[in-house]
Amino acid sequence: MKEKINTLLKHAEDIWRKLCKNEIQAKIEKYEKEINQKNFWNDPKRAQKVIKAQSILKNKIDPWEELINKIKDLSDLCEIAENEKDTNGLEIEFNTLEKQYKDLLTISYFKEELDANNAFLTIHSGAGGTEACDWVAMLYRMYSRYAERKKYKTELIDLLEAEGGIKSVTIEIKGEYAYGLLKSEVGIHRLIRISPFDAAKKRHTSFASVFVDPVIDDKIEITIKPEDIRIDTYRASGAGGQHVNKTSSAVRITHIETGIVTQSQSDRSQHKNKDLAMKVLKSRLYEYYKSKEDEKNKSKQDTKKEISWGNQIRSYVFQPYNLVKDHRTKFENSNTTSVMDGNIDNFIEEYLKWKSLN
């Protein structure tokens, strides 16, 4: 046990030193000097932005210092326990600290300004007809369960039902680092299974696309003029055209220049649906223009490959064997039931590691 504790301590101290040696500590000190200036609050919007930026950076270092102190305390307890030949309970405490270490390691991979923000997650059905719509419903449940496991909150923004499942769905996932974690899910997801909709019990392949955008807070200004958009209202409807209500409460917003379309029909209030659709539009415009400016990264518009065979980032195979495999990181898990119940943390962690090296 002593050796395991010392190894964990060494790893934690190595990460802490790397974080302090890079520009993080210098930026924290720079923000601290700015905050202490007499005229700091003359520009409240700028002041709030600085405080949030400093808080995000501190949250990358302070928890490591706390963890290191806890591991050192456990190391001292281990020596006492071994001398008294009573090590009961040390394993439980070690496992708790090891999990904290893994969680903090994941957070250390986040580099982008909005990684700590909430996220909009959208799933669209691809090739596969009814089977593909059922696949969207399965993924919707998977991400909802993931959010539940993380103690994140979710809000339904838009849902278009279809025979056998869901044609498309957009949800907001609210929680710290929701965007930073879930952007690993962007891409084509492939399902291979014996279709419950096929009387001949043949094997079918279906596709769905997942897109993730950061929720833009008030500290980032995205200006949208009335003449830049077209707003359409329509009746919210369910599968087969069944009306959820008889008023035109659903809202669709089209950004004319980019062609980006957002919509919401989750609320009975047209005003609320308009606000939600506008909120999603701001997030997608931020990502659109950001990717346009960044020549090193491909625009999301360029990465929207055809939702079909050969472009998938991850495959979920239920027949003839059980396996979920990420084609980017090569990480795989044969427990498909667990994965579909939202246990995708390992896939996300492996992606973040892979992304940091590529």
From Swiss-Prot:
Location of N5-methylglutamine modifications: Q242
Cellular compartments annotated: Cytoplasm
Coiled coil: none
HAMAP family from the UniProt entry: Rel_fac_2 (MF_00094)
A GO term for molecular function: translation release factor activity, codon specific
GO cellular component: cytoplasm
Record NCBIfam families: prfB
Post-translational modifications: Methylated by PrmC. Methylation increases the termination efficiency of RF2.
Organism: Borreliella burgdorferi (strain ATCC 35210 / DSM 4680 / CIP 102532 / B31) (Borrelia burgdorferi)
Protein name per the record: Peptide chain release factor 2
Described purpose of this protein according to its UniProt entry: Peptide chain release factor 2 directs the termination of translation in response to the peptide chain termination codons UGA and UAA.
Matches recorded under Gene3D superfamilies: 3.30.160.20, 3.30.70.1660, Release factor (1.20.58.410)
Signal sequence segment: none
Membrane spanning residue stretches: none
